[in-house]
C-alpha cells in the first residue's frame, strides 16, 4: 500500500540536494486590472475618439528605474475598441495626472493649465510689475495679435461668402418657408386621413342598414310563401275531406238500401212458411243468415227506426211458429 500511494520516498546516501536543478516558474509580469480612462484620448491608428470614463481591462506594470521622489510610476496597456491597437499611458505623480506614452494622443483641454504655462505666466506678471515699459510692450503685442486674428476671421468669412451662392439670410428664409410648407402638408394629410376614416365609417353603416333591410325583405317574402303554401295545402285538404264525405255518404246510402232489401226478404220468407217442424228449421236458418249479414255489414245510425220494425216482425213470426 505504501509503494502504491508513494508516501515514503527513497533517498540514497550520496544524495546532494544542492545539485538538483531548480525549476523556473514563469510568473506573469503584468497584473490585470479594470480601469477607467482618466482623460479623453484619440487613437493614432484609426482616429477613434475615446471619451473619459470608458472602461478597459488593462494590464498594469511598474516602470523600471523610474520614480518621482520615491513614488513608483505605473504603466497601463490598453486596447482600442475599434481597431484593437495597443495604447499605453503612464502615471505622472509630479503633476498628479496621467500621460499618454504611445499609441494615442491626449485631447486639448483649455481649462487645464500645465506647470510650465503656470510658471511662464507668473514670471511675465512679475516682469510687468517691475518695469512699465515691458508691460506697455506686452499690451501692444496682445492688441496686435487680436487685430490679426480678427482680420483672419473676416478673410475667412469673405471667402466663404464668395464660394457660397446663397446668402445666410436667404438660407434662413428658405428653411422657414420649407418648415411652414411641411407643416401645412402634414395638416392636409391629417385632414384627409380623418375624412377617409369617417367616410368609411358612414359607408359601413349604410352597408349594414342595406344588409338588414335585405334580410328583413327576405324574411317577409319567405313568410308570404309559407302562408301561400299553407293555403294551398288547406285547399287540397278541404277538397280531399269533401270527397271523403261524399264517398262516406254514398257508402251509407248503399248500406241502407241493402239493409232494407234484407229486411223485406226476411219478412216475405216468414209469411210464406207453413206450420211444420221442417219449415221451422228453415225459418230459423234464414233468420240466422239475416243476423250474420247484419254483423258483417255496418248499420248506419240514421236507420235506427227500421231496425226495431224488422226485429219485432222477426220475433212475432218466431212466436207464431212455436204456438203452432
From Swiss-Prot:
Q: Name one GO biological process term.
A: RNA splicing
Residues in coiled coil:
none
User: Is Zinc included in the keywords of this UniProt record?
Assistant: yes
Q: Which InterPro entries match?
A: Saf4/Yju2 (IPR007590), Yju2 (IPR043701)
GO CC, sorted alphabetically, is: U2-type catalytic step 1 spliceosome
User: What is its subcellular localisation?
Assistant: Nucleus
Q: Which GO terms describe its molecular function?
A: metal ion binding
Q: Which UniProt keywords apply?
A: Metal-binding, mRNA processing, mRNA splicing, Nucleus, Spliceosome, Zinc
**Amino acids binding Zn(2+):** 43, 46, 80, 83
**UniProt KW Metal-binding keyword:** yes
Q: Which PANTHER family match?
A: SPLICING FACTOR YJU2
Q: What does this protein do?
A: Part of the spliceosome which catalyzes two sequential transesterification reactions, first the excision of the non-coding intron from pre-mRNA and then the ligation of the coding exons to form the mature mRNA. Plays a role in stabilizing the structure of the spliceosome catalytic core and docking of the branch helix into the active site, producing 5'-exon and lariat intron-3'-intermediates.
Q: How does it assemble?
A: Component of the spliceosome. Present in the activated B complex, the catalytically activated B* complex which catalyzes the branching, the catalytic step 1 C complex catalyzing the exon ligation, and the postcatalytic P complex containing the ligated exons (mRNA) and the excised lariat intron.
The protein, known as? Splicing factor YJU2
- Biological source species: Dictyostelium discoideum (Social amoeba)
Which gene underlies this protein?
yju2
Amino acid at each position: 500500500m505504501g509503494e502504491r500511494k508513494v508516501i515514503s520516498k527513497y533517498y540514497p546516501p550520496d544524495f546532494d540536494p544542492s545539485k538538483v536543478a531548480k525549476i523556473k516558474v514563469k510568473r506573469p509580469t503584468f497584473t490585470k486590472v479594470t480601469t477607467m480612462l482618466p482623460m479623453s484620448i484619440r487613437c493614432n491608428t484609426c482616429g477613434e475618439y475615446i471619451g473619459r470614463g470608458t472602461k478597459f481591462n488593462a494590464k498594469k506594470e511598474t516602470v523600471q528605474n523610474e520614480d518621482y521622489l520615491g513614488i513608483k510610476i505605473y504603466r497601463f496597456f490598453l486596447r482600442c475598441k475599434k481597431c484593437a491597437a495597443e495604447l499605453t499611458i503612464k502615471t505622472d505623480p509630479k503633476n498628479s495626472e496621467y500621460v499618454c506614452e504611445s499609441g494615442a494622443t491626449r485631447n486639448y483641454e483649455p481649462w487645464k493649465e500645465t506647470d510650465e504655462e503656470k510658471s511662464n505666466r507668473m514670471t511675465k506678471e512679475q516682469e510687468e510689475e517691475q518695469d512699465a515699459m515691458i508691460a506697455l510692450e506686452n499690451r501692444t503685442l496682445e492688441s496686435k495679435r487680436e487685430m490679426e486674428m480678427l482680420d483672419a476671421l473676416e478673410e475667412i468669412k469673405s471667402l466663404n461668402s464668395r464660394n457660397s451662392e446663397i446668402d445666410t439670410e436667404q438660407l434662413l428664409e428658405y428653411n422657414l418657408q420649407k418648415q411652414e410648407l411641411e407643416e401645412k402638408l402634414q395638416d392636409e394629410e391629417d385632414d384627409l386621413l380623418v375624412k377617409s376614416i369617417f367616410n368609411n365609417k358612414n359607408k359601413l353603416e349604410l352597408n349594414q342598414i342595406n344588409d338588414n333591410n335585405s334580410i328583413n325583405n327576405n324574411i317577409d317574402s319567405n313568410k308570404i310563401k309559407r302562408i301561400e303554401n299553407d293555403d294551398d295545402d288547406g285547399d287540397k285538404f278541404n277538397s280531399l275531406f269533401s270527397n271523403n264525405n261524399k264517398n262516406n255518404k254514398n257508402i251509407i246510402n248503399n248500406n241502407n238500401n241493402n239493409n232494407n232489401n234484407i229486411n223485406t226478404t226476411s219478412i216475405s220468407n216468414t209469411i210464406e212458411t207453413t206450420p211444420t217442424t221442417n219449415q221451422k228449421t228453415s225459418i230459423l236458418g234464414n233468420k240466422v243468415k239475416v243476423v250474420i249479414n247484419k254483423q258483417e255489414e255496418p248499420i248506419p245510425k240514421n236507420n235506427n227506426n227500421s231496425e226495431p220494425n224488422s226485429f219485432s216482425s222477426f220475433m212475432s213470426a218466431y212466436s207464431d211458429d212455436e204456438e203452432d
